[in-house]
């Protein structure tokens, strides 16, 4: 996935969920949009180097968007969770998700279920059961362990219930945890943050719902991040 043209700055603060103040290399201060409403644990500390993009849209109050955080150890995290579906869509098109590579038709944002949900991707293939794929972003990393979620997710809990219902109807149901952070090589659910999500997903997996985690890798050109891709599955610690 190609990233938009990025510029760097220093983070001053994040506030009101959707806003952040940054300090430009010139010393000027600018307010930008933050698309991530989660806790962003470890990915949004004062003084962090951040990378932001610019939009030419005339309707946006804040034309600049926070895209990435560069951590003190040099690792990168894409905090713009709107990018995750684009990342996974390209991986599905390129047959990079080996567990789903047999499907040829990809339908994004399809309404389904009894709780007024939209599945991120519905996959279809000749002679194959329909496959419902829910995408979750991995931005929380401790050591080399990627985790989800970084805050209690009632929406995520709902998605697990919906996926289990699809599985019971004879379809495939998959949670795909996509690495938006390049600092992990194994994955687990952060049960200490959302024990209910952990419980629901474990019960769903016992009944046939599938879950996979894939690592992310950034491409760098002239010291500027230019692309992000999913590389390979990592061990899922249950």
From Swiss-Prot:
Matching InterPro entries: SfsA (IPR005224), SfsA_C (IPR040452), SfsA_N (IPR041465)
Cysteines joined through disulfide linkages: none
Pfam families associated with the record: SfsA, SfsA_N
Signal peptide: none
Superkingdom of source: Bacteria
GO molecular function: DNA binding
Family to which the UniProt record says this protein belongs: Belongs to the SfsA family.
Record-given protein name: Sugar fermentation stimulation protein homolog
